Amino acid sequence: MRNLIFFVIPFHFWLPAEGFKLNTNLLETNLINLGVVLGLLVYFGKGVLNNLLDKRKQTILSTIRDAEERYKEATDKLKQAQIRLQQAELKANEIRVNGLSEMEKEKQDLINIADEDSKRLEDSKNATIRFEEQRAIEQVRQQVSRLALERASEVLNNCLNSELHSRMIDYHIGLLKTMGSTTE
């Protein structure tokens, strides 16, 4: 019971005769108080502190694991994005090369078509020229024949009598008829 009194009654009311006295040395008193408080804290707070530290440790470890998982996911996504980028670049290069080759092919096709058109026009021009030459030659031939016949007719008219003249005319008319039927 006496021990209980010591706790209930503050120290400054205790009588110095009983063996307890008021310690006025603040340094000593604070060290003892600090020692007692620290001892009590260590004894009673050890479990609580360990519990708090374990929870904090688990929280930090789970955060680190989550961060590592997110890092792996981000790395995987980055690799996939890089692969898609490379595929897109390859596709773009393929499209560009195909476009260039297609453009070259179209260019060559246009050149070939233009050459063919030019050759056809040249052939058509040459055919037209040959046709016109043949027509001109035929006209000249007909004119020469007509003039020759007229000249021969004049010569014969002057030189021949009317009977011979009639026979010659008939002969040449027959000749012209056969000539006319072969030209048509």
Curated annotation (Swiss-Prot):
Its main location: plastid. The chain crosses the membrane at residues 29-49. GO terms for molecular function: ATP binding; proton-transporting ATP synthase activity, rotational mechanism. It holds the Pfam family ATP-synt_B. The keyword Iron-sulfur does not apply. Keywords: ATP synthesis, ATP-binding, CF(0), Chloroplast, Hydrogen ion transport, Ion transport, Membrane, Nucleotide-binding, Plastid, Thylakoid, Transmembrane, Transmembrane helix, Transport. The keyword Transmembrane helix applies. It is found in: Plastid, Chloroplast thylakoid membrane. Signal peptide: none annotated. One of its GO terms (cellular component) is proton-transporting ATP synthase complex. It is a single-pass membrane protein. F-type ATPases have 2 components, F(1) - the catalytic core - and F(0) - the membrane proton channel. F(1) has five subunits: alpha(3), beta(3), gamma(1), delta(1), epsilon(1). F(0) has four main subunits: a(1), b(1), b'(1) and c(10-14). The alpha and beta chains form an alternating ring which encloses part of the gamma chain. F(1) is attached to F(0) by a central stalk formed by the gamma and epsilon chains, while a peripheral stalk is formed by the delta, b and b' chains. HAMAP family: ATP_synth_b_bprime (MF_01398). In plastids the F-type ATPase is also known as CF(1)CF(0). Belongs to the ATPase B chain family. PANTHER family: ATP SYNTHASE SUBUNIT B, CHLOROPLASTIC (PTHR34264:SF3). F(1)F(0) ATP synthase produces ATP from ADP in the presence of a proton or sodium gradient. F-type ATPases consist of two structural domains, F(1) containing the extramembraneous catalytic core and F(0) containing the membrane proton channel, linked together by a central stalk and a peripheral stalk. During catalysis, ATP synthesis in the catalytic domain of F(1) is coupled via a rotary mechanism of the central stalk subunits to proton translocation. This is ATP synthase subunit b, chloroplastic.
